[in-house]
């Protein structure tokens, strides 16, 4: 089996160059699960001093850069916060959201808070269910069904999400602004 980085070494070099230019502290490695997937790992503090320091993994799907469905949000680069874990944050804020929206789960889902935080999705990862940042809204997606976004652009988008998430958790912006998605 040939992985995307073996069959398209030029794309691999471009991915590495983009990450080294914009996120030089991130390191690339291969998943130890036998899947052949590559990932980047590093920390960012997008809100600046006093903000949360996020330990992040950017995981390439083996189909990179091909996107096979318009529902494949985020393209082929998945953003997994290791610390803080989104699942932990979501579980902490969900009771507040439930109270705010009078325990109306249909309304909570319509408002975009079905998992407790806006613009996240859950997926099995190893032995755990983890929450990932949805790293691209289809209307802002930099790519198409032929070419996916790069890790650098996915992480840039995720950093904007992290800033707004922190502001929302601190009560600095409203639910509506947090859900708008124009980050």
Question: Where does each model-flagged region fall?
Answer:
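UBC/E2-like fold recognition across ubiquitin and ubiquitin-like conjugation systems
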Residues: 1-183
């Amino acid at each position: 089996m040939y992985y995307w980085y073996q069959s398209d070494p030029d794309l691999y070099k471009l991915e590495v160059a983009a990450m080294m230019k914009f996120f030089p502290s991130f390191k690339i490695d291969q998943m130890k699960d036998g899947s052949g997937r590559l990932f980047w790992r590093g920390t960012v503090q997008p809100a600046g001093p006093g903000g949360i320091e996020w330990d992040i993994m950017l995981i390439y799907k083996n189909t990179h850069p091909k996107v096979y469905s318009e529902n494949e949000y985020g393209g082929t680069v998945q953003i997994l916060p290791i610390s803080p874990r989104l699942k932990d944050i979501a579980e902490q804020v969900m009771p507040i959201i439930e109270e705010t929206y009078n325990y109306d789960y249909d309304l909570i889902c319509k408002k975009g808070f079905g998992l407790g935080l806006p613009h996240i999705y859950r997926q099995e990862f190893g032995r755990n269910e983890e929450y990932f940042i949805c790293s691209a809204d289809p209307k802002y997606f930099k790519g198409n069904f032929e070419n996916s976004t790069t890790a650098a652009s996915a992480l840039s988008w995720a950093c904007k999400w992290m800033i707004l998430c922190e502001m929302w958790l601190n009560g600095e912006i409203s639910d509506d602004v947090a859900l708008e998605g124009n980050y």
